[in-house]
């Protein structure tokens, strides 16, 4: 039997953690991984130029003044070791015939092997409305991140939404589905339905 693998990307506050849990419960997938923990594991070993010791919203500082280009340069520096790890985790799950969901801030399909891209369901979730996005960040302490106040992240909404726009462009270029979570219940159901269709076609 083929592995059922979902790789879901999105910046903080868009609902990827809770959606991943919802899909796992509704598909009986036991393994759900967050790139936050992969990043924490890699920090002592990652090359210095990846700047993984720095929060992603500050990684632009290694390139000078804040600009969209520098935000993305810092993001991609951090993404390289993370995406390398994600690529290998998915390849291992495929080799073992295991089911897996990975949710990640870092979502750069161009850094993944074509074999992995062909055999995993990729999706990117986002929020259209910046005010709603800010509100969701501030509320997430009540749901999924009880010891991580969202106000700290909301202060960097500009950086996160720059990363979001870049990632959405990359996803469009690869024909990867985009899912607006402005209507959260609708988005998670669409994702679940599309994932099931992907699995059934394989």
Swiss-Prot record:
<keyword id="KW-0444">Lipid biosynthesis</keyword>
<dbReference type="GO" id="GO:0019287">
    <property type="term" value="P:isopentenyl diphosphate biosynthetic process, mevalonate pathway"/>
</dbReference>
<dbReference type="GO" id="GO:0016773">
    <property type="term" value="F:phosphotransferase activity, alcohol group as acceptor"/>
</dbReference>
<keyword id="KW-0808">Transferase</keyword>
<keyword id="KW-0067">ATP-binding</keyword>
<keyword id="KW-0418">Kinase</keyword>
<keyword id="KW-0547">Nucleotide-binding</keyword>
<dbReference type="InterPro" id="IPR027417">
    <property type="entry name" value="P-loop_NTPase"/>
</dbReference>
<protein>
    <recommendedName>
        <fullName>Mevalonate-3-phosphate 5-kinase</fullName>
        <ecNumber>2.7.1.186</ecNumber>
    </recommendedName>
</protein>
<dbReference type="GO" id="GO:0005524">
    <property type="term" value="F:ATP binding"/>
</dbReference>
<keyword id="KW-0414">Isoprene biosynthesis</keyword>
<comment type="function">
    <text>Phosphorylates mevalonate 3-phosphate to form mevalonate 3,5-bisphosphate. Functions in an alternative mevalonate pathway, only present in extreme acidophiles of the Thermoplasmatales order, which passes through mevalonate 3-phosphate rather than mevalonate 5-phosphate.</text>
</comment>
<comment type="pathway">
    <text>Isoprenoid biosynthesis; isopentenyl diphosphate biosynthesis via mevalonate pathway.</text>
</comment>
<dbReference type="GO" id="GO:0016301">
    <property type="term" value="F:kinase activity"/>
</dbReference>
<keyword id="KW-0443">Lipid metabolism</keyword>
């Amino acid at each position: 039997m083929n592995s059922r693998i979902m790789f879901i990307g999105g910046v903080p506050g868009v609902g990827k953690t809770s959606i991943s849990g919802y899909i796992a419960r509704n598909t009986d997938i036991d393994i759900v991984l967050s790139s936050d923990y992969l990043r924490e594991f890699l920090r002592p070993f990652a090359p210095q130029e990846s700047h993984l010791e720095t929060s992603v919203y500050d990684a632009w500082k290694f390139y000078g003044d804040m600009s969209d280009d520098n935000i993305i340069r810092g993001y991609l520096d951090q993404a390289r070791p993370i995406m390398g790890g994600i690529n290998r985790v998915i390849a291992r799950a495929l080799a073992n015939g295991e089911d897996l969901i990975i949710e990640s801030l870092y979502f750069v399909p161009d850094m993944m092997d074509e074999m992995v891209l062909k055999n995993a369901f990729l999706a990117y979730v986002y929020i259209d409305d910046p005010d709603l996005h800010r509100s969701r960040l501030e509320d997430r302490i009540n749901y999924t991140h009880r010891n991580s106040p969202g106000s700290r992240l909301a202060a960097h909404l500009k950086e996160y939404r720059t990363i979001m726009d870049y990632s959405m462009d990359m996803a469009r270029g690869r024909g990867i589905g985009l899912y607006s979570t402005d209507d959260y219940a609708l988005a998670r159901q669409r994702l679940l339905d599309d994932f099931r269709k992907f699995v059934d076609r394989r």
